[in-house]
Amino acid sequence: MGMRMMFTVFLLVVLATTVVFFTSDRASDGRKAAASDLITLTIKGCCSNPACMVNNPQICGRRR
């Protein structure tokens, strides 16, 4: 292979790697956001329950 062909193959490999990296990164961001939403809903559920709120003041923002 000539120099020009090797450079072209190199650029194609870099481009393919970059596309795969950004695509998988976005997918993991979505999973992180979904997990964060679930945690938030769980904490809000505890904070709306008086018994849970008293037992977990650090979660609900109230310090003893």
Curated annotation (Swiss-Prot):
GO cellular component: extracellular region; host cell postsynaptic membrane
Secretion signal span: 1-18
Keywords, in A-Z order: Acetylcholine receptor inhibiting toxin, Amidation, Disulfide bond, G-protein coupled receptor impairing toxin, Neurotoxin, Postsynaptic neurotoxin, Secreted, Signal, Toxin
UniProt KW Disulfide bond keyword: yes
Subcellular localization(s) per the UniProt record: Secreted
Tissue spec. comment: Expressed by the venom duct.
The keyword Disulfide bond belongs to this UniProt entry's keyword annotation: yes
Pfam families: Toxin_8 (PF07365)
Superkingdom of the source species: Eukaryota
Region of interest (Ser-Xaa-Pro motif, crucial for potent interaction with nAChR), residue spans: 48-50
GO molecular function: acetylcholine receptor inhibitor activity; toxin activity
Cross-referenced InterPro entries: Conotoxin_a-typ, Conotoxin_a-typ_CS
Note: Negative results: does not show activity on alpha-3/beta-4 (CHRNA3/CHRNB4), alpha-4/beta-2 (CHRNA4/CHRNB2) and alpha-4/beta-4 (CHRNA4/CHRNB4) acetylcholine receptors.
Record's function text: Alpha-conotoxins act on postsynaptic membranes, they bind to the nicotinic acetylcholine receptors (nAChR) and thus inhibit them. Shows inhibition on alpha-3-beta-2/CHRNA3-CHRNB2 (IC(50)=75 nM), alpha-7/CHRNA7 (IC(50)=637 nM) and alpha-9-alpha-10/CHRNA9-CHRNA10 nAChRs (IC(50)=1000 nM). In addition, it also shows inhibition on high-voltage activated (HVA) calcium channels currents (30% at 100 nM) that are mediated by GABA(B) receptors (GABBR1 and GABBR2).
Name of the protein this chain belongs to: Alpha-conotoxin Vc1.2
